[in-house]
Amino acid sequence: MDKHIVVIGAGIAGLSAASYLARNGYRVTVVEKHSLPGGLCTSWKRGGYTIDYCIHWLMGSREGTQFYSMWQELGAFTNADGSPVGIANFDQFTTIGLSNGDSLCLSSDLEQLKESLLLLAPEDAKQIGKFHRSLKRLAGAFSGNPFASLVQFFTMLGHLIPVEEYAKRFTNPRLREIFLSTLPPDWSLIALTLGLSQQPYKSAGYPIGGSLNFAMNIARKAASLGVTFRYNSPVEKVLVSEGKAVGVQLSDGQIVDADYVVSAADGHTTLYSMLSGHYVNPAYKKAYEQYPLFPSTVMVALGIKKDLQQFVHSSSPYFEESIVLCDGTSHNSFSLNVYAFDHTLAPEGCTLVTVMINTWEWEAWEKLASDNRQEYEAEKKRIAGEIIKRLEPLLGPLEGLIDMVDVSTPHSVIRYTGNWKGSFEGFAPTKATLSARLPKTLDGLSRFAMIGQWTVPGGGLPTAAKDGRDIAKMICKQDGKRFSGKG
């Protein structure tokens, strides 16, 4: 009889692993705590709108570029009715607001981007030229041969520099501000340049229908290959016998036996709860004690009874009056996304608008939601009001036009996904973390593996999906099977 593999978590890594394992002859059961697949790659419905939480740009969205064939294998680009997923590409990557009231458009055309930077800071012409050339090299490294890993490695090395250090190469204060306002100072430059570099090739677009539709497409393909999904099934612990993983126990006491267990769940929960901290090796101990994390978010979603096609899809406006959250953090900027380009997310003639504010102060939100639910809801309402007040100078008068308001917080992220500290993408992309290697297997425990954003610092959907594919290849190799991605 074929081996039975239990995959914990139906996020993109778990879905990918399940899909590739099934097409290689394994019986696969996915156990997921939520009622839907996708994990953090998700959307939800409110008042006729679909609120998208995850994808802003997706590498591999164009045929012939890296990751495209993997997404095709996974069924990500085929909708439930058999139609292809449309891809939205944009003339600009984003627009960044500056503290002096100016703004700069980061054009998707790298030549136009270069000219904009030269116009802003002619005194930095030499360094702007170097930046422009590095973007072109990075674009080429990821947009051609999907097996050019060596080229990618050496190209990326120059983009691992912390953004604070890189900004010092420029003398113009506004140009420095562009880099420093985009990323935390210790994050690697690659967090900005990778997505930006792919825009000329149209190889990092937005899949129409949003993040949950994208995840549902992958789950549907996996199910067609024979994968069994058990939703609303939180895992209490991984069962171990004689140093081997033999199954999982669910929170309701049910046992699911397995010949192999793959955890694509939150890494901290897997190591310290499901495995009771027994197999934490030095690499993971260091990671969870020292590595910085991606933040959590406060997201305000608005349904606006107006077509906002004339506004840019992505921007980070600057405000003199900061927004102060209940966690004590103060913010003069936020990420603004206008989804007028995706009519599947809003009723006809209307537009979904989302605002994201990053915060690492997750504990304050957990405490408020636990201690005083009424005050927690009042804080969400207050923040929505603050956001609307700041959006009106940008989008025009909104009175009487807002027919949906939804606010999610770090508490929401933890509640629905279980992600450690509410982080939306695991370990942050710094020079140290991106250079680190975290093992997929644990010493002293066989027939078990970990995958996903907590095993690959820097995160990202393509990385998660590739991680699932790679673990299937590893298991096939262990069992003497010839791996196939077809099916």
Residue ranges of model-derived segments:
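C-terminal segments that line or cap access tunnels to active or ligand-binding sites in enzymes
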Residues: 305-408
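Helical element adjacent to the flavin cofactor pocket in flavoenzyme catalytic cores
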Residues: 198-245
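A glycine-rich dinucleotide-binding beta-alpha-beta segment and adjacent secondary-structure elements
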Residues: 173-186, 396-457
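Extreme N-terminal leader/targeting segments of oxidoreductases
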Residues: 1-5, 23-24, 432, 483-487
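A conserved FAD-binding loop/helix module that cradles the flavin
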Residues: 55, 453-475
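Mid-domain catalytic core of redox enzymes
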Residues: 206, 236-348
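N-terminal glycine-rich phosphate/pyrophosphate-binding loop and immediately adjacent elements
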Residues: 2-129
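Rossmann-like flavin
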Residues: 99-192
